[in-house]
């Protein structure tokens, strides 16, 4: 959402590895290009593969922009790690513990 992006700190780095549509891609491009946020790291897009006229292509060469293809999920090791993390999270929850907190 454009308003949320506008409220970010100037040194904030937005990472989107969820879904491309979660973020307003055009607003992110504007915020990075105008140096209103520190940068972005993205491996999910509203349309894949990225077309030459996709908004991210305007900022792709900037040092504070990291655009990667969304391929990590396919690896066997990634699926094993996901299951292991899920089990650890469930065990921690059942024990009343907190994991992976960002405060």
Can you describe what each PLM-predicted range is?
Residues 2, 11-13, 17-103:
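Rossmann-like dinucleotide-binding domain for NAD(H)/NADP(H)
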Residues 5:
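Short alpha-helical donor nucleotide-sugar binding micro-motif in glycosyltransferases
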């Amino acid at each position: 959402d454009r308003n949320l992006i506008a409220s970010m700190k100037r040194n904030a780095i937005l990472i989107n590895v969820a879904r491309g549509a979660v973020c307003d891609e055009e607003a992110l491009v504007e915020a990075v290009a105008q140096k209103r946020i520190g940068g972005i790291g993205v491996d999910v897009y509203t349309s894949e593969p990225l077309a030459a006229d996709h908004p991210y292509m305007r900022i792709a060469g900037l040092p504070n922009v990291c655009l990667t293809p969304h391929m990590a999920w396919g690896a066997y090791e990634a699926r094993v790690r996901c299951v292991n993390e899920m089990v650890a999270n469930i065990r921690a929850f059942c024990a009343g513990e907190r994991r992976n907190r960002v405060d």
